[in-house]
Amino acid sequence: MYMIQSGMKMLNNNKVQHVYLIGSKSLGAYGGYETFVYKLTEYHQNNPTIKYHVACKANGEGYMDESKLDNAVKISENEFIFHNALCYKIHIPQIGPAQAIYYDVAALNACCNDIKHNNISHPIVYIMACRIGPFARFFYHKIHKLGGKVFLNPDGHEWMRAKWSA
């Protein structure tokens, strides 16, 4: 189980909204979710009332290489700050197509552990793709029990759209 290591403490009061971004592989040019996260954190980087926590893929296709980002500050082997967001890397075993599910589950575990360990009040967990399938209910319940809210990108439910129905 991965634990966010930085120990980076913030004022944990109602003035700071902690937002955990799950589902993008990196920040930047890999794809749509990655570009969304890059632009979102860039736009809010000087806003002291929002603190982003971004899960990034540590290895494999589309992995996060923070050395390619201007002004990224390395905290540890698995963490760095970029656009004032705490980015944490999730190591993924090479297990074929199941990597995406493993990555999201590991990222959500790290997110929940960080919320609990740092006593984060009213966190928001934004999931960019619905790849967790049967694990969704477990994490929704766990995050709600920790006082958080879960937001799911509707594109993660592409298969549910009427245009694909038989």
Where are these regions (language model features)?
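Non-catalytic membrane-proximal stalk/linker segments that position and tether the catalytic domains
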Residues: 1-17
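N-terminal strand-loop element at the rim of the active site
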Residues: 16, 21-30, 43-98
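Conserved alpha-helical elements of sugar-nucleotide-dependent glycosyltransferases
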Residues: 32-40, 103
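A generic structural motif
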Residues: 47-53, 120-121, 147-148
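An aromatic- and histidine-rich active-site surface loop
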Residues: 99-110, 122-155, 159
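Glycine-rich phosphate-binding loop signature in dinucleotide/nucleotide-binding domains
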Residues: 114-122
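Membrane-proximal helix-turn-helix segments that form the acceptor-binding/catalytic region
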Residues: 166
